[in-house]
Regions:
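Beta/alpha (TIM)-barrel catalytic core signal, keyed to glycine-rich beta->alpha loops juxtaposed to Asp/Glu
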Residues: 1-137
Length: 137
């Protein structure tokens, strides 16, 4: 439903240059989701993603089932790395906004961002992320 609203708003108000939306690996089909990001890309609009950690729910108190799924990856990542890299892996995201709570947290975000780039996930990593998202839902 939210995708319809996004399209309607962008059609009615064509002066937008950038759009902010919530997105994480468990939000692919929530609100405008990945379909919304792709639509923005097709319109040559910038996209800002906020809250990729879902208020830290994706990095704190991780269930053992999720940890076991992450362990199937050839590259070992922290939950923070999985969440941020999922966003940076996309070619339709221009900026990421997240709550930074400490200097140490900022340093960790910078370190992850410095190793992140578009299309860096392997097919196996994409399958793992899909499985993790399903497990959360």
């Amino acid at each position: 439903m939210e995708m319809d609203y996004l399209v309607e708003i962008l059609d009615d108000y064509p002066k937008f240059e950038i759009v902010t939306s919530q997105m994480s690996y468990i939000d692919e089909h929530y609100k405008a989701g990945t379909q919304g990001l792709e639509h923005l890309k097709n319109l040559n609009l910038g996209s800002i993603v906020k809250n990729p950690l879902r208020n830290n729910c994706l990095i704190e108190n991780i269930p053992i089932e999720i940890k076991e799924l992450f362990d199937y990856s050839d590259i070992k990542r922290t939950p923070l790395e999985w969440a941020l890299q999922y966003i940076w892996n996309r070619d339709d995201v221009h900026c990421l906004i997240n709550n930074i709570k400490s200097l140490e947290n900022l340093k960790e975000h910078i370190e992850v961002a410095s190793r992140s780039y578009v299309n860096s996930f392997s097919e196996n990593d994409c399958e793992i992320i899909r499985a993790v998202a399903i497990e959360y839902w």
